[in-house]
Regions:
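Intrinsically disordered, low-complexity segments enriched in small/flexible residues
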Residues: 1-70, 170-200, 212-214, 218-305
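Short, histidine-centered active-site or binding-site loop motifs used for metal coordination
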Residues: 37-40, 89, 152, 208
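Short acidic-aromatic active-site loops that bind/stabilize oxyanions
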Residues: 42-43, 47, 93-101
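Short strand->helix junction
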Residues: 42-43, 75, 125, 157
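Single, functionally critical "micro-switch" positions that shape active/binding sites
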Residues: 45, 80, 137
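Conserved catalytic cores of soluble enzyme domains
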Residues: 97-101, 105, 109-246
């Protein structure tokens, strides 16, 4: 559908809508592929977008070859809808916060462990939850002008939708025999702790936010069409449902001690605030796998919890 095989969502609004809610629309873009579009303000991800992602995966698993998540706007997503979280925090509704974080995590994990290929097509701002969703896709089709980053630190929280877990997993995958593992861990920790945003898809790959199997596209107008082709390629290669990882190497107490010393000296040097220290320690705790007496191997779910 669209011009010369290009996917143009605007042209499909009257004929090819499969499902919609207030924040998302699910289109049939032909060849048994679906496309989920966000249309909240700045494409932020609140409850309606989480519902949309889950619905899209359910529909695709029943009747389609796979799913693209992407839109034709300037930005893929400015991240999770934090307004809602701050409101709940202000009202001290911490159980509600835990539930919404859990729902977000479960949705990210579902994107990765569904029975169909999920390709995320990114462009422009792809921040926070937008980055986390990309990190959990089977593949990303990134426009070269994709500005990606786990920016939650900047607003005083840790990336809790699976971004911290995913950085820990990718750190573990980078370890080679004889490597100074703590140095690699520190580098990836700093990507989160400085809320660094990549200025291009190539830089996002260098930062470890995109995988070497993710693809880059120069032409913005062909982004969704290329993402659709990626879905079909994955399907035709005999896509099989993945199993959750159980072999993520974490450093335990040895890593934690290194981080705590560094973070405390930054606090005393007045480089960071007391709250920054709290968030940095929490991130380090997750990335080191908690208070383990020695380095070991843990599962994805262990890190999320």
């Amino acid at each position: 559908p669209g011009y010369k095989g290009l996917v143009i969502l605007d042209a499909l609004k009257t004929t090819n809508v499969v499902w919609k809610n207030s924040g998302t629309t699910l289109y049939n873009v032909g060849d048994e592929v679906l496309n989920l579009e966000f249309h909240t303000k700045m494409n932020t991800m609140g409850a309606e977008v989480i519902e949309g992602i889950n619905k899209a995966i359910s529909v695709a698993e029943k009747n389609y070859k796979g799913l693209v998540i992407g839109n034709e706007g300037d930005n893929f997503s400015a991240g999770a809808n934090l307004g809602m979280l701050f409101m709940l925090a202000g009202n001290r509704e911490f159980d509600e916060i835990n539930l919404s974080v859990q729902a977000f995590q479960n949705t990210m994990m579902r994107a990765r462990y569904s029975s169909i290929p999920v390709v995320v097509a990114t462009s422009g701002l792809t921040l926070g939850g937008g980055t986390e969703l990309s990190m959990h896709a089977d593949q990303v089709r990134a426009h070269t002008e994709t500005y990606m980053g786990l920016v939650e630190f900047g607003v005083g929280i840790i990336p809790s939708g699976g971004g911290t877990k995913e950085m820990t997993l990718r750190t573990s995958d980078m370890y080679k025999k004889g490597d100074p593992e703590l140095n690699i861990l520190m580098e990836n920790f700093m990507t989160i702790a400085t809320a660094k945003v990549a200025t291009s898809s190539k830089e996002a790959a260098a930062m470890g936010l995109l995988k070497h199997t993710d693809k880059h596209t120069l032409n913005r107008s062909s982004l969704l069409s290329e993402a659709k082709n990626d879905v079909l390629n994955l399907y035709n290669e005999g896509y099989t449902q993945k199993k959750q990882r159980q072999n993520i190497k974490v450093q335990g107490r040895a890593g934690l001690a290194m981080f705590e010393a560094g973070i405390t000296s930054m606090l005393y040097g007045k480089y960071i605030s007391d709250h920054d220290r709290k968030i940095a320690n929490k991130t380090a705790y997750v990335m080191c796998g908690g208070d383990l007496s020695q380095p070991g191997y843990v599962s994805e779910q262990y890190l999320l919890d």
